[in-house]
Regions:
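Short histidine-centered beta-strand/loop micro-motifs
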Residues: 63-68, 110-113
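Structural motif
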Residues: 74, 81-83, 90, 108, ...
Length: 224
């Protein structure tokens, strides 16, 4: 007989709408509003990884373009059609697309919403590390405000886009070919797994960490 579903859920089961913060995220000295976040990882008791649900209204971005020395990051598009800003170029994304940013590569990134509709993202990364350093290629004024500036970031070729959401620049700066750090789960699934000696099929999955070269986070898309 199937177990009865419980009417009351434990504290580590929550809906993102009950956790969303106020719409005031911005950099010091700037009145530009960024994404609206819900800190899922912290609210659910996770201490080693950070997981956020983020909403991007039209014309906003998740952050200034940046690269980090010691913290990995992963972005999954739940809804909408944002652009991934990577090393000065825009790459269009859609629902089900995933982007991975290994630490220490100097790969500069941000997610921009140049569309007319809201975008929803699931963003995962490592919790803040004291040894982490950060670099803002388009905002050098941040250097004076931060003690964690990344001075010896690996050099990378930079494209012409300045990282600011601007629908008038969108078509001229958008790239056609995708980078290896952008994948859609629908083209990457592996056959359903099962335990040895048992023919019960489990979930059908995609190992994003392995595909992106992310070594300190285990990130999978699973379909049941």
């Amino acid at each position: 007989m199937p177990a009865r579903r419980q009417p009351d859920r434990p504290d580590f089961i929550r809906h993102w709408t009950t956790l969303e913060g106020v719409d005031d995220a911005a950099y010091e000295g700037s009145d530009e509003l960024l994404s609206i976040g819900a800190p899922l990882g912290r609210a659910l008791g996770l201490t080693r990884i950070g997981i956020h649900h983020e909403r991007l209204p039209p014309g906003r971005r998740t952050s200034y373009p940046h690269a980090e020395s010691a913290e990995e990051e992963f972005v999954f598009v739940l809804q909408g059609r944002p652009d991934a800003w990577i090393d000065g170029r825009l790459y269009p994304l859609g629902e089900g697309d995933a982007v991975g940013f290994p630490a220490g590569t100097g790969l500069c990134h941000s997610i921009l919403n140049n569309s007319d509709d809201e975008v929803r993202l699931l963003v995962a990364g490592e919790r803040s590390k004291p040894e982490n350093r950060i670099y803002y290629p388009c905002n050098p004024e941040q250097r004076a405000r931060r003690a964690d500036w990344w001075d010896d970031v690996p050099p990378r070729p930079m494209g012409p886009h300045d990282g600011v959401p601007d629908r008038g620049r969108r078509d001229s700066a958008k790239e056609g070919a995708r980078l290896a750090c952008i994948l859609n789960w629908q083209g990457e699934e592996q056959p359903a797994d099962h335990y040895a000696g048992d023919d019960e099929k489990m979930l059908i999955g995609v190992d994003f960490s392995n595909r992106f070269g992310i070594t300190r986070l285990g990130i999978h898309h699973g379909r049941l």
